[in-house]
Swiss-Prot record:
Domain of life: Bacteria
Active site (record annotation): H47
Record's protein name: 3-hydroxyacyl-[acyl-carrier-protein] dehydratase FabZ
Catalytic activity from the UniProt record: a (3R)-hydroxyacyl-[ACP] = a (2E)-enoyl-[ACP] + H2O
Amino acid sequence: MEINEIKEYLPHRYPFLLVDRVLEIKPGEFIAGVKNITYNEPQFTGHFPDHPIMPGVLIIEAMAQVAGILGFVTTGKKPADGYTYYLAGTDKVRFKKPVVPGDQLRLEAEIVTDKRGIWKFACRALVDGNVVCSAEILTAERRL
């Protein structure tokens, strides 16, 4: 899935659209996407000027965004239909290595449960095949 199609599933835009490409998607099961980390991104101005590191909260947000795409594709809905997914919670978040400019962040999400519009995903972010972050992410589907 290319960026123009991603924009059909996510309401986010620059500088907060954190998914560059979807590599694989199995509706109702799994998604894998990528975020290319570049020094030109605004967060690196202050995090940190002489030692740029991708903020952990943005890694979590990127994982939540791919999870949201999976939810939308699974249900056959899009933001244009008047729906969105809100980040509702995180559990078991672990950061294992810093993510720096030049890295390609692979984002993976697997559906654990879906009960009445509350979705639970098992998520991972990887760089060069190594897990840099893992989390359980909850999203809430809402009609706008």
